[in-house]
C-alpha cells in the first residue's frame, strides 16, 4: 500500500541565499520522497503565487514559514492516508483545498513541494526511476540543452537589457556530447572575456555577465567562442535568446537602455528579425511583453516559421492562457516552469496541450534553484525534447545536467538525442 503516513514541510535555502520550501513525504512502506521548489527573479504577472511571510525582520520578508506551516497542518490533514500513486487525484485535492485560481491561499511553493515529493515517493516505492514513473516505456528522448552562457537583464548587473544569450548544441550526436560541446564553449568564452580585461564572475544561472558594447557584441563574442572551441556556428551549435521583454516594456514601447533605443512592437520585431538573419538564432523566448498580444502576433507572423518563439511570461505554464495563444496563433512554443502553476498534473497538462497543437515545450529551471533535479526527469519522462537549466557552472545547475547524464546512461542504446529535430515547430 502506498498510503501517505507523514508529511513534513521545512524552510531551506536556495541558490541565491533566499528561503524556499522543501517537503518530505513518507509512505506506509517506509519509503520517502523529498522535493524542494525553485523561485524566479523575472516573473510573469499571472504566475501562481509564491507564498512569502512578509516579515521584514526575517530574511527581509522572504521567509516561507507560512507555506511550510500550511504543509504541516492543512495540507497534511487533507492528503494523509491517500494513495501516493494517485497523482492526479492528489493534485486535484491540493487545488480544491487551496480554492483560488492562482494558489494564493496555500502558496504554489507549498502545493508544488508536496506534489513533487509524493511523485518521488511513489516512484521509489514502485522501483522505477522517476523519469520512467512519469513517462512509462515511451520515455527515451533526451532533451537538447539550451545553455545560458551570457546573462543580462534581471539576472545580471550589466548594460544588457536582454536576459539570456544561449548556446544550443543541435549538431551533437548524444546528450553527453552536447554537454561536452557546451562546456568547451563555456571555458573558451571565459578565456575570451578574461583576455578583454572583463570580469568572469557568473550570474544567477551560471552564465557570465560582462558589460559589453551592446547586444550584438555579446552575440559575436559567443560566436567567437564557438569557433575557437572548434565548432561550427549554426550547424553544430545554434543560438537562443531570452529577451524577457516584459522587463523593459513601458508605455507601449520597448526601452533598450543599453542600446539607447525606444522601439514599437513592429520596430522591435524588425530588430530581432535582423539579428536572426545575421546570426544562427533559432529560438527567442519572451520576444514581446506578456501583455502585448498584438506585438506577439506581429512577431509570430514575421518570424514564426523560422524561429522558435517561446512564451514564458506570456503563458506561465497555464493551460487556459496557452489555449488562448494557440487559438490566436501567438508564439509556437511554451516554457514549462513547474512553480508557475504549482502541481505536476497541471504541468503535464500544459506540456500535452502544447504538443497536440504543434507547439514545442521547453522544460525550465528558475534563477533561484536548489539541488532538486526533478525537472531533468520531467524532460525525459514527457519526451519534451528541450531543457533550459543554466550554464556550465554552479552546482544547482549541474544537478540537472548530471541527472540527465545518468538517465542517458540508464537508457543505454534506446536513448535518442533529437538535435535539430527538437524544433519540430519549425518544419
UniProtKB/Swiss-Prot annotation:
Cofactors that this protein relies on: Mg(2+)
Q: Per the UniProt entry, what is one GO biological process? A: glycolytic process
The record's Gene Ontology cellular component field reads: cell surface; extracellular region; phosphopyruvate hydratase complex
**Bound how, and how many: what does the cofactor note say?**
Binds a second Mg(2+) ion via substrate during catalysis.
Concerning Pfam families, the annotation shows: Enolase_C, Enolase_N
Q: What is its main location?
A: cytoplasm
Q: Reaction catalysed?
A: (2R)-2-phosphoglycerate = phosphoenolpyruvate + H2O
Q: In which pathway does it act?
A: Carbohydrate degradation; glycolysis; pyruvate from D-glyceraldehyde 3-phosphate: step 4/5
PROSITE patterns given for it?
ENOLASE
Residues bound to Mg(2+) are 242, 285, 312
What keyword terms does UniProt attach to this protein? Answer: Cytoplasm, Glycolysis, Lyase, Magnesium, Metal-binding, Secreted
Entry annotation: catalytic residues: 205 (proton donor), 337 (proton acceptor)
Places the protein is found: Cytoplasm; Secreted; Cell surface
Q: Identify the domain of life.
A: Bacteria
Which HAMAP family does this chain map to?
Enolase
Q: What's this chain's function?
A: Catalyzes the reversible conversion of 2-phosphoglycerate (2-PG) into phosphoenolpyruvate (PEP). It is essential for the degradation of carbohydrates via glycolysis.
Protein name as catalogued:
Enolase
Q: Which organism is it from?
A: Herminiimonas arsenicoxydans
Amino acid at each position: 500500500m502506498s498510503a501517505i503516513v507523514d508529511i513534513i514541510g521545512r524552510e531551506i535555502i536556495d541558490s541565491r541565499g533566499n528561503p524556499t520550501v522543501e517537503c518530505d513525504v513518507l509512505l506506509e512502506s517506509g519509503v520517502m520522497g523529498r522535493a524542494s521548489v525553485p523561485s524566479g527573479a523575472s516573473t510573469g504577472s499571472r504566475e501562481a503565487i509564491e507564498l512569502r511571510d512578509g516579515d521584514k525582520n526575517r530574511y527581509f520578508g522572504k521567509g516561507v514559514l507560512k507555506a511550510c506551516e500550511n504543509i504541516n497542518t492543512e495540507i497534511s490533514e487533507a492528503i494523509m492516508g491517500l494513495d501516493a500513486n494517485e497523482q492526479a487525484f492528489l493534485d486535484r485535492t491540493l487545488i480544491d483545498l487551496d480554492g483560488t485560481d492562482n494558489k494564493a491561499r496555500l502558496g504554489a511553493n507549498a502545493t508544488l513541494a508536496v506534489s513533487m515529493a509524493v511523485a518521488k515517493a511513489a516512484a521509489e516505492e514502485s522501483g522505477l526511476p522517476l523519469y520512467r514513473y512519469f513517462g512509462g516505456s515511451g520515455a527515451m528522448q533526451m532533451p537538447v540543452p539550451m545553455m545560458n552562457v551570457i546573462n543580462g537583464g534581471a539576472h545580471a548587473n550589466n548594460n544588457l537589457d536582454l536576459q539570456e544569450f544561449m548556446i544550443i548544441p543541435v549538431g551533437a550526436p548524444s546528450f553527453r556530447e552536447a554537454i561536452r560541446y557546451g562546456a568547451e564553449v563555456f571555458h573558451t568564452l571565459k578565456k575570451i572575456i578574461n583576455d578583454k580585461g572583463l570580469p568572469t564572475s557568473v550570474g544567477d544561472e551560471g552564465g557570465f555577465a560582462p558589460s559589453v558594447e551592446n547586444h550584438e557584441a555579446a552575440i559575436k563574442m559567443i560566436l567567437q567562442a564557438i569557433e575557437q572551441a572548434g565548432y561550427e556556428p549554426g550547424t553544430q551549435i545554434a543560438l537562443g535568446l531570452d529577451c524577457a521583454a516584459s522587463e523593459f516594456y513601458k508605455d507601449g514601447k520597448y526601452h533598450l537602455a543599453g542600446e539607447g533605443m525606444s522601439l514599437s512592437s513592429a520596430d522591435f520585431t524588425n530588430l530581432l528579425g535582423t539579428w536572426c538573419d545575421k546570426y544562427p538564432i533559432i529560438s527567442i523566448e519572451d520576444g514581446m511583453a506578456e501583455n502585448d498580444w498584438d506585438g506577439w502576433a506581429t512577431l509570430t507572423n514575421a518570424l514564426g516559421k523560422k524561429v522558435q518563439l517561446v512564451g514564458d511570461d506570456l503563458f506561465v505554464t497555464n493551460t487556459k492562457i496557452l489555449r488562448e495563444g494557440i487559438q490566436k496563433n501567438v508564439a509556437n512554443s511554451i516554457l514549462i516552469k513547474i512553480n508557475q502553476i504549482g502541481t505536476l498534473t497541471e504541468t503535464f497538462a500544459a506540456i500535452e496541450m502544447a504538443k497536440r497543437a504543434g507547439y514545442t515545450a521547453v522544460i525550465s529551471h528558475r534563477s533561484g534553484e536548489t539541488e532538486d533535479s526533478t525537472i531533468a526527469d520531467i524532460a525525459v519522462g514527457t519526451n519534451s525534447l528541450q531543457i533550459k537549466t543554466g550554464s556550465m557552472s554552479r552546482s544547482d545547475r549541474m544537478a540537472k545536467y548530471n541527472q540527465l547524464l545518468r538517465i542517458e546512461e540508464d537508457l543505454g542504446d534506446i536513448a535518442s538525442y533529437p538535435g535539430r529535430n527538437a524544433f519540430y515547430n519549425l518544419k
